Amino acid sequence: MEAGYYRIPMTTTDSTKFHDLLSGFVRIHILHHAAEGEVYGQWLIEELARHGYRISPGTLYPMLQAMEERGYLNSREDRDGRLGRRRKLYRTTAAGRRGLKAARERLRELTGEVGQKAGRRGQ
């Protein structure tokens, strides 16, 4: 693993404890961006970092492969115009868009409930 990378931690030092919880949010981010247009691994790493996730290529690429195998993403190979390197571009499938829609509905419900309880209990 490259120096400075962890397995999907947030920005805190305790975050590796929450890997199993946060990986679902990372997948939702991936589906969201891949629904808007084609995305590739390095761009996703940088975009996720803007949201506080530090994810290594060794974690992201197997996640993308699994999402493709489960039918949430399609990929195609392309050449990076600047460097001429091959890269994989990902886009959501119909199943991925349905999954994203379901995730958004659940997130709205969850954030409403968590926000209510936090306000009510002073947490």
Where are these regions (language model features)?
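Short beta-strand/turn micro-motifs at beta-sheet edges
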Residues: 16-20, 77-79
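Basic amphipathic alpha-helical segments that dock to polyanions
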Residues: 60-62, 66-70
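N-terminal helix-turn-helix DNA-binding core of bacterial DNA-binding proteins
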Residues: 18-61
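Beta-hairpin "wing" of winged helix-turn-helix
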Residues: 70-86, 91
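A cross-family signal for key residues in well-ordered alpha-helices
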Residues: 29-32, 65, 101, 108
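Amphipathic alpha-helical dimerization/coiled-coil segments
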Residues: 7-8, 97-123
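Short, intrinsically disordered or compositionally biased N-terminal tails of bacterial proteins
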Residues: 1-17
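Accessory beta->alpha helical hairpin/"wing" motif in late/C-terminal subdomains of nucleic-acid enzymes
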Residues: 92-96
